[in-house]
Amino acid sequence: MAKVIGIDLGTTNSCVAVMDGKDAKVIENAEGARTTPSMVAFSDDGERLVGQPAKRQAVTNPTNTLFAVKRLIGRRYEDPTVEKDKHLVPFTIVKGDNGDAWVEANGKGYSPAQISAMILQKMKETAESYLGEKVEKAVITVPAYFNDAQRQATKDAGRIAGLEVLRIINEPTAAALAYGLDKKEGKTIAVYDLGGGTFDISILEIGDGVFEVKSTNGDTFLGGEDFDMRLVEYLVGEFKRDNGIDLKNDKLALQRLKEAAEKAKIELSSSQQTEINLPFITADASGPKHLTLKLTRAKLESLVDDLVQRTIAPCKAALKDAGVTAAEIDEVVLVGGMSRMPKVQEVVKQLFGKEPHKGVNPDEVVALGAAIQAGVLQGDVKDVLLLDVTPLSLGIETLGGVFTRLIERNTTIPTKKSQTFSTAEDNQQAVTIRVSQGEREMAADNKLLGQFDLVGLPPSPRGMPQIEVTFDIDANGIVQVSAKDKGTGKEQQIRIQASGGLSDADIEKMVKDAEAHATEDKKRREAVEARNQAESLIHSTEKSLKDYGDKVSEADRTAISDAIAALKTASEATEPDADDIKAKTQTLMEVSMKLGQAIYEAQQAEGGAAAGDASAEGGDNVVDADYEEIKDDDRKKSA
């Protein structure tokens, strides 16, 4: 049975894990790292780079290197948070055909789901390389506070990547699974998850294989990226003050500043001071300019203090919704790279009145939890019951634009809820059901998930028709809504698709595009591997020809030289053809066989001569030594 993998699709880094026997195991990528940067880059010649290779070239190719795209997934172009991001990233955010926020590279638009799919493909390949078999099914994690549109877009990304997404699981819940799988006694825990782009807090009751989420809260636009940007803004301001040059419009300089800010932030988690040193950051008429600045931990903490404080209100709301006090929390589990920051740990300690638990790897625990959930679905992990909740209230718009809740936030899922409504006007023959998600009292202030019409109602006075609206949320947190006229039995239902979102046709097109890219990438990789093998063979054959060429005939030497030249031409081509390189490699191996034979015979002859000399020199000594050493008396003495 093919393995189901667990993927933590992160804003900054992603991670893949799988059940190995009874334990979940993180799989290392091709570069030997346990996490992969969530970055995709497009070079000028159209080559696509994912992960570490994309990150390595970001400084020289800032406008075509896409990062933190998860923050845009399932969001409209006009969204205020998208507006904010537009001015902070070096790449271009554009309006997609469906009104969603898309990104642009080399003049081509990509949906965030497409870019996420490229990262998922990389994770899929990492798992396939380790397992030695095809992987087609996965459990993918999302921030607990993701709304329906964002969950649907993540599922679409999996589909584009060629994966059947068996379950979308909340990141804090996944972390709790990994933390509490072997814990028998009952506990109430808080999972504080501050990652690269999102913040979640979940309160869970765990024990004896049952993981029940009591409440969840968070902010889907708060994370390490914001901390980095705050530091970048400070560096830009300091440089402008000292040199009178504004680096804000220099995309290359901004990318260098961003990398330096991230590095400094990480260093300041373990040291009190660091130095940011960026030579040749820019130039003016007087010559090149360098940025050198000492940064203390205290200064960084003062710059980001309000960001850390923003995590407190969701924590208090989650505690209130769960009906527990901070003192009743047995353990606070820290998740996400930003939770390593001493200031964050200090705030958590003050809030919950106890030292947070640091026994899990904050970068890997979510992927491990996803792998455990995959094991549960596959039947490999027994006696685990996971009860998650919907993070936001769901309802419809009623008379006067009021938001009428059908399902309250923190309701355990899967769940189904019905409520009966009626018409607002006489002889109304159709009603529009507008489905929203959020906590505000007016529907317009909440996130519109979608709308549909129930038509064909018989003319009747207002308030007479009985229209039953049913909300159905599955275990992934994805919503289906139906409306039924009780009088006529007419029914209309939709699986909620955001007013933007991707249509099935869009997804199908992107799947084909991804498959074409996968084939292209495979060809490119095969060509690189063939070229590497060819270069190695050329080097060893040239060396052998130089050392032992006199042992073969002139005709053989010429044939070998010609084969080397042909292979060099094939491997140095602008668009190398793997099959052509392999064929010419084979030819060189065949014509070199006589040379190999000559080398073998020469080495054998040398070895035989050396062995003969050694026995001639050492023969007498050996016999004498044996004769002198082996004596009965000596044996008795030694015994």
UniProtKB/Swiss-Prot annotation:
DNA-binding recorded as keyword: no
SUPFAM superfamilies: Actin-like ATPase domain, Heat shock protein 70kD (HSP70), C-terminal subdomain, Heat shock protein 70kD (HSP70), peptide-binding domain
Feature: compositional bias, Basic and acidic residues: 516-529
Induction: By stress conditions e.g. heat shock.
Stretches the record annotates as Disordered: 516-542, 605-639
Superkingdom, taxonomy of origin: Bacteria
Alphabetized InterPro entries for the sequence: ATPase_NBD, Chaperone_DnaK, Heat_shock_70_CS, HSP70_C_sf, HSP70_peptide-bd_sf, Hsp_70_fam
Keyword list, A-Z: ATP-binding, Chaperone, Nucleotide-binding, Phosphoprotein, Stress response
Pfam family of the protein (one): HSP70
GO molecular function terms listed in the Swiss-Prot or TrEMBL record: ATP binding; ATP-dependent protein folding chaperone; unfolded protein binding
Biased composition (Low complexity): 605-619
Gene3D superfamilies: 1.20.1270.10, 3.30.420.40, Actin, Chain A, domain 4 (3.90.640.10), Substrate Binding Domain Of DNAk, Chain A, domain 1 (2.60.34.10)
This protein's name: Chaperone protein DnaK
Phosphothreonine: residues carrying this PTM: T198
Family membership noted in the UniProt record: Belongs to the heat shock protein 70 family.
Xref: NCBIfam families: PRK00290.1, PRK05183.1, prok_dnaK
Known role: Acts as a chaperone.
Keyword Protein biosynthesis on entry: no
